[in-house]
Amino acid sequence: MRRRGKYLIFELDGDEELIIHLRMTGQLRLNEGEYTRLIFHIDGMKLYFSDLRRMGEMHLVRKGSYENIEGLATMGPEPLSESFTLSYLMDVLRKKGGKIKAVLMDQAVVAGIGNIYANEILFEAGIHPGRPAKSLTQKEIEAIYNATKKILQEALAAGGETFSNYVNIYGEAGTYQPRVY
């Protein structure tokens, strides 16, 4: 299994992959939940897909065939990868219209940043979320770039931010404490 942005990619036997996006309320569980929508039978075990709001999505595709999965086919670089550089971010922000928060959340610009982390990044950088992306100075873009790396590394180390009863595979809630909310 691997991850790309907010997509989970499961390599199956043969030439196929199962692509899952949990959206806001989706969960993969080892026990049946109130909102179980699908049960996977794997080597004598069961894996339950639970989704209160029915927003999650699944795709069964040939390995590497992501062109028909809208968000995955056009996804930008991972924010903690070597391909997410300061020069890349400067180039994108100077060309992209719209408010900086919306641009950061655009998965074609940078993979995996959602509402909470966009707010955290901009707060750390001292940039108003409603600022037009094209109006940012080089110094402000550098602050956003550095804040992106810092906030996401902190969140990863803390197991992420947890709303409601969402937990990791070991049943533990994330301990990242947002500064904005």
What are these regions (language model features)?
Residues 1-181:
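Structured catalytic/nucleic-acid-binding cores of DNA maintenance enzymes
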